[in-house]
Amino acid sequence: QGRLEALFNYQTLITELTGLPVANASLLDEGTAAAEAMILSYNNSKNKNTFLVDIEVFPQTLEVLQTRAKPLGIEIKLIDWYTITELEDFDDAFGLLVQLPNNKGRLRDPNAFLRIADVYKCMKIAIVDPMCQVLMQPVGEMGFDVAVGSMQRFGVPMGFGGPHAAFFACTDKYKRKIPGRIVGQSLDSQGNKALRLALQTREQHIRRDKATSNICTAQALLANMAGFYAAYHGAEGLNKIATRILKYRQTLQKALRWCGIEVDESEGFDTVRFKSFLVLEGFNVRYEDGHTLITLDECTT
């Protein structure tokens, strides 16, 4: 019961952050969670095989999506914020995925994407940063059907890339199609409240080849770490942490401008993008299109 209660706390955290009513007890990582969201939307569609993906999703996530899509005959179509007026390209789309903030650290208004998804009856999926969700409008309130992401920022070290628990939340409409474990509240034989794994008829140990997913596990340890991180800090503490990160970004932007460096002025949360001189000086930094990106967190000094 203690283990289930900890995971139930984690699920509650995810629903409060995303504004979506149903969340599972975690998945393996952000990339596979995005792929599971794609499969959910694909299985929910009728005779459509195109999945629209924000061109600025993280590259590792895009590679997982492409790998998972290929054997199913799904076409991944990358779309740009500036070319989404080409409505004729979206007739065969069953789902749309947006990253907030995106691969360049930009946090843009997704309403244009959401309008297109509504016109073509696509499922709307958001990959979100949970710490950013502390300050921004929950994606569920924006109109997204599914939200996925990584909980690494909630008290879990980077660990050379992993492991990190992923989250998966959705509207009530899809609760019987969501992948992974779900902890639910029930009553025991004496009528007392008790926790148990719920809606297990979705899973392959019961449904076998007709299961909603062949993901039958969770990153329970990492999910519990993230859940207790949130419980320790509380809502007010998380808000202070997220606000501090945002202020660090603003401070770094101001310092770079003062040094005469051209800074990307797009809205964002924790990442500063600027014209790079660091590569020429021999620094080992992320470098693309003549720009360097620096991402900050609560450990920044």
Question: Across the structure, where does each feature detected by a protein language model lie?
Answer:
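Active-site C-terminal subdomain of aminotransferase-like
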Residues: F154-C259, D264-S266
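Conserved PLP-binding catalytic core of the aspartate aminotransferase-like
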Residues: R257-E281, L296-C299
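Short acidic (Asp/Glu) and glycine-rich catalytic loops that position anionic groups and cofactors
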Residues: S45-N47, A93, V146-G149, T201-R208, ...
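PLP-dependent enzyme catalytic core of the Aspartate aminotransferase-like
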Residues: T12, F283-T301
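Glycine-rich ThDP/TPP pyrophosphate-binding loop and its adjacent helix/strand module
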Residues: T67, L72-I74, I79-T83, E267, ...
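Conserved N-terminal alpha-helix of the aminotransferase class I/II PLP-enzyme fold
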Residues: Q1-A33
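Hydrophobic alpha-helical scaffolding
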Residues: L27, F51-F58, L100-K104, I125-A126, ...
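Conserved PLP-enzyme active-site core in the AAT-like
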Residues: T32-A194
